Amino acid sequence: MSVIVVAEFPMTEQGAQDFIDWSKNADGYVITRQHKGFEDIRTFLAEDKKTVYLYEKWDSKEDHQAYLSFRVENGLMDFLNPRLDGDFKVTYFSEE
């Protein structure tokens, strides 16, 4: 059964736009879509123009965590840290 992942990123307004731009380039979701277990990803920008939400669907929590590890090892936090305006949060949900 698939797992739903919701990630919340509190960012500066410019940081949110940088993240959205990054997601659309060759280093963004193009790579995400190639990972084992990937099913879907959608990006939402809150009304404050600073909080980015990701809605993701993966085959399993383990597949998503392996993907996150890959991203961290390849410099994602170096990109995110100067743009974040607080701690980001990842929550896992099961479909009932």
Question: Predicted regions span which residues?
Answer:
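Solvent-exposed beta-strand sheet faces enriched in polar/charged residues
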Residues: 44, 91-93
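Non-catalytic surface loops within mature trypsin-like serine protease
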Residues: 11-13, 60, 94-96
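Short, well-ordered beta-strand segments in beta-rich or mixed alpha/beta enzyme
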Residues: 3-10, 39-68
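Short, surface-exposed ligand-recognition loops at beta-strand->loop->(often short) alpha-helix junctions
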Residues: 10-23
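Absolute protein N-terminus
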Residues: 1-2, 96
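An amphipathic, aromatic/His-enriched active-site/gating alpha helix that lines ligand/cofactor pockets
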Residues: 25-39, 57-91
